[in-house]
Curated annotation (Swiss-Prot):
Keywords for the protein's UniProt record, in alphabetical order: Galactitol metabolism
SUPFAM superfamilies tied to this protein: Aldolase
Keyword Ribosomal protein (UniProt): no
Record-level GO BP terms: D-tagatose 6-phosphate catabolic process; galactitol metabolic process; phosphoenolpyruvate-dependent sugar phosphotransferase system
Pathway the protein takes part in: Carbohydrate metabolism; D-tagatose 6-phosphate degradation; D-glyceraldehyde 3-phosphate and glycerone phosphate from D-tagatose 6-phosphate: step 2/2
GO cellular component term, pick one: plasma membrane
Lineage: Bacteria, Pseudomonadati, Pseudomonadota, Gammaproteobacteria, Enterobacterales
Organism: Shigella flexneri
PANTHER family associated with the record: D-TAGATOSE-1,6-BISPHOSPHATE ALDOLASE SUBUNIT GATZ, N-ACETYLGALACTOSAMINE PERMEASE II COMPONENT-RELATED
Protein name, entry field: D-tagatose-1,6-bisphosphate aldolase subunit GatZ
A Pfam family that the UniProt record links to this protein: GatZ_KbaZ-like
Family according to the record: Belongs to the GatZ/KbaZ family. GatZ subfamily.
Described function: Component of the tagatose-1,6-bisphosphate aldolase GatYZ that is required for full activity and stability of the Y subunit. Could have a chaperone-like function for the proper and stable folding of GatY. When expressed alone, GatZ does not show any aldolase activity. Is involved in the catabolism of galactitol.
């Protein structure tokens, strides 16, 4: 990461796409997409997804590392070209506890990530815990981030410190996604970004972390990009020019969260304006979802009723029976919630792919379709871009390759923006 940031600060138009997903097909696509390039691939886990207790994926940081490396070995992607990151590392998962208890767990969380070889660490202590003021004072956020940084430094080896990099600050809203419709978004004021940097510098120095400050490569701000279930707030470069100019006088770049669904031109403009780390997650699993839904429609027409996976019905049943991952985010009317379950840009369906019933139904569908020739006309109907690539000889009509290529469509836009 440090080399890439140095190149950007030297005036090169270069950025990196941060793949924030634990889905094996998304990770496989991200690695396969850059297999024949010289680029490194940044893959990040969030604190609620992967932590010392397993998170919602059931994986510790060491488990996640091995999970990613196993996929890399299968794809033929060199492990040393993978950068592992930890996103929103702090009390995010333990906000219902008092600050002391939550920070104690957060310290162990950061240590677990660093011990597992994660080299890009987002120190985010912005969440209020039980008994805290809402929002937290910037000085408190910075002091807690310094505690987390001290934890990281305490377990890092000399070799790890050479690669270790920190990201500070947080976006609005806090992690978890928009729970209601958005019409506009608050762009971070330069004064607030400067205050975030100033308070963190002061807190780090007070804890004897002056050297660690040199490892702070980025600050998270809101450049004016966001999405909810059916709306996208697109990047308006002119609105972020004050931010773009301010960061030029520092050693850092910006990290932009929720950049999903922007145009490829917007990604290029974001990188030009020093938002050099672009986070993406739901857009990747949304593309995966689109591909699986398309293949399910194809299966419906090609496979005998008694052998069909019933994939779409299974997904719907499971999500209606177990609504904990979408209930507080989606609309309440039955028809509206069904539409959101299937098609929301927030893509809460991503939390359900590991569910045994859904996983089994998708596997059945894939086996069914591997055993038949999918007519080109059906691919044109349901996956038109992939049809064009089959026609030009770039792609085969195998279901797995069709899914990969659909995810590549998202990655192509980021590659354009982060052009190397």
């Amino acid at each position: 990461m440090k080399t890439l940031i140095a190149r950007h600060k030297a005036g090169e138009h270069i950025g990196i796409c941060s793949v924030c997903s634990a889905h094996p097909l998304v990770i496989e696509a991200a690695l396969a997409f850059d297999r024949n390039s010289t680029r490194k691939v940044l893959i990040e886990a969030t604190s609620n997804q992967v932590n010392q207790f397993g998170g919602y994926t059931g994986m510790t940081p060491a488990d996640f590392r091995e999970f990613v490396f196993t996929i890399a070995d299968k794809v033929g992607f060199a492990r040393e070209r993978i950068i592992l990151g930890g996103d929103h590392l702090g009390p995010n998962c333990w906000q219902q506890e008092n600050a002391d208890a939550a920070m104690e767990k957060s310290v162990e969380l950061v240590k677990a990530y660093v011990r597992a070889g994660f080299s890009k660490i987002h120190l985010d202590a912005s969440m209020s815990c039980a008994g805290d003021t809402i929002p937290l004072a910037p000085e408190t956020v910075a002091e807690r981030a310094a505690v987390l940084c001290f934890a990281a430094e305490s377990v890092a080896t000399d070799c790890q410190r050479e690669q270790l990099s920190y990201v500070i600050g947080t976006e609005v809203p806090v992690p978890g996604g928009e729970a209601s419709a958005i019409q506009s978004v608050h762009i971070t004021h330069v004064e607030d970004a400067a205050n975030t940097l100033r308070t963190h510098q002061k807190a780090f120095i007070a804890r004897g972390l002056t050297e660690a400050l040199t490892r702070v490569i980025a600050i998270v701000v809101q450049p004016g990009v966001e999405f909810d279930h059916s709306n996208i707030i697109h990047y308006q470069p002119q609105e972020a020019q004050a931010l773009a100019q301010w960061i030029e006088n520092t050693r850092m770049v910006y990290e932009a969260h929720s950049t999903d669904y922007q145009t490829r031109t917007a990604y290029w403009e974001l990188v030009r304006d020093h938002f050099a780390i672009l986070k993406v997650g739901p857009a990747l699993t949304f593309a995966l979802r689109e591909a699986i839904f398309a293949l399910a429609q194809i299966e419906q027409e090609l496979i005998a009723p008694e052998n069909r996976s019933g994939c779409l019905a299974v997904i719907e049943e499971v999500m209606l029976d177990e609504p904990q991952y979408w209930k507080k985010y989606y609309r309440t009317g039955f028809n509206d919630s069904l539409l959101d379950i299937r098609y929301s840009l927030s893509d809460r369906i991503r939390y359900y792919w590991p569910h045994s019933r859904i996983k089994n139904s998708v596997e059945t569908m894939m086996v069914n379709l591997q055993g038949v020739d999918i007519p080109l006309g059906m691919i044109s109907q349901y996956l038109p871009k992939q049809f064009e690539r089959i026609q030009s000889g770039e792609l085969s009509a195998m279901p797995h390759q069709l899914i990969m290529n659909k995810i590549y469509d998202v990655l192509r836009a980021y590659r354009y923006g982060c052009a190397e």
